[in-house]
Amino acid sequence: MVQKLSRRLFLSIGTAFTVVVGSQLLSSCGQSPDAPIADTPGEQQEINLYSSRHYNTDNELYAKFTAETGIKVNLIEGKADELLERIKSEGANSPADVLLTVDLARLWRAEEDGIFQPVQSEILETNVPEYLRSPDGMWFGFTKRARVIMYNKGKVKPEELSTYEELADPKWKGRVIIRSSSNEYNQSLVASLVVADGEESTLAWAKGFVSNFAREPQGNDTAQIEAVSSGEADLTLANTYYMGRLLESEDPAQKAIAENVGVFFPNQEGRGTHVNVSGVGVVKTAPNREGAVKFIEFLVSEPAQAFLAQNNYEYPVLAGVPLNKSVASFGEFKSDTTSLDKLGPALAPATKIMNEAGWK
């Protein structure tokens, strides 16, 4: 069972947390994170999940978790930054058990702000590759997405493409589009360049890359793919699952957009293609720590990984899980296995570089 709690309902949280959901009272916030979980007969366990992901497939997955464990999921949705600020403002009495969000940048900020507590779990350490999780067990990636070059098949040949760095070449002038520098996916990508190439080289790259823009940054990844498909530009950088959605759409027009666009994995002869994650961690003041850990372990289990791969067009973190057929059609690729935790300190210089280069 997934109980979605409205944003307005939580705005009145003060030093104590009491909220009625239907006929149930949630009043476990005073419990220590390490305290044992009550096992009163007939009393259903529950966790409060703060999530910035807004996919219907996720709700189905949470219902599967409840069916398997008996633990109800109270879902509180919001934008990532809003949820981070809410948890901080709620302080020691925060009802949040789990914070789930997209992108390294948000996970890093949450860890830096002291929102997470460490988790030791053999399941998590086995199922999640080391480079996709915090070395201290603060957060764990549970799905991957690759940030790839997507190109108009009629205007660009794949053999013309090679690396992220090469996109600063003047031959691409007026041919490139991308979303805003305020987007966390782009910030994490540039952070990966800072780690790989250094700040000075990345600044030079960013200036060249920006000079190749066909228009000012606007729209999300889908908007970039649509513009490339229509011929407004020749190529973009976008996350793979956006293309998966278009290819799997029941709308013929959406499929047609995708069919005009090719997917190219950059840097295959070197460090590999940049990958990012949706990630999750146990909140420091979690009333139900045990239930929170069970939830995260469930997310990286084989059935959950298969469900996410097939229905949300993401790459699983668990090895051996079959991909959605449309995602599999992109081909196999080499991932950049630089620890995402190492990219965290590079986010601030990456943002500065993007601003200095004029990336709006």
From Swiss-Prot:
Please give the knockout or disruption phenotype noted for this protein: Cells grow normally in the absence of iron but have a reduced capacity for Fe(3+) uptake; double knockouts of this gene and futA2 (slr0531) grow very poorly in the absence of iron and have a marked reduction in their ability to take up Fe(3+).
One BP annotation, GO: iron ion transport
Tell me which species this is from: Synechocystis sp. (strain ATCC 27184 / PCC 6803 / Kazusa)
Keywords from the UniProt entry: Cell membrane, Ion transport, Iron, Iron transport, Lipoprotein, Membrane, Metal-binding, Palmitate, Signal, Thylakoid, Transport
This protein's GO cellular component annotations are:
plasma membrane-derived thylakoid membrane
Kindly list the places in or outside the cell where this protein is found, as annotated in its UniProt entry: Cellular thylakoid membrane; Cell membrane
Principal subcellular localization: membrane
Membrane topology, record value: Lipid-anchor
GO MF annotation list: metal ion binding
Q: Does the keyword Cell membrane apply?
A: yes
Name of the gene: futA1
- Lipidation residue positions, type S-diacylglycerol cysteine: C29
UniProt protein name: Iron uptake protein A1
Give the highest taxon in the source lineage: Bacteria
InterPro entries membership: Ferric-bd (IPR026045), SBP (IPR006059)
Question: Quick one: where's the N-palmitoyl cysteine lipidation?
Answer: C29
SUPFAM superfamilies assigned to the protein according to its UniProt record, in alphabetical order: Periplasmic binding protein-like II
Family according to the record: Belongs to the bacterial solute-binding protein 1 family.
Functionally, this protein is described as follows:
Plays an important role in protecting the acceptor side of photosystem II (PSII) against oxidative damage, especially under iron-limiting growth conditions. The differing subcellular locations of futA1 (predominantly thylakoid lumen) and futA2 (predominantly periplasmic) suggest they may fulfill different roles.
Induction of this protein: by what?
Transcript levels increase when cells are grown in the absence of iron. Protein levels increase when cells are grown in the absence of iron.
- List of residues binding Fe cation: H54, Y55, Y185, Y241, Y242
Q: Where is the signal peptide?
A: 1-28
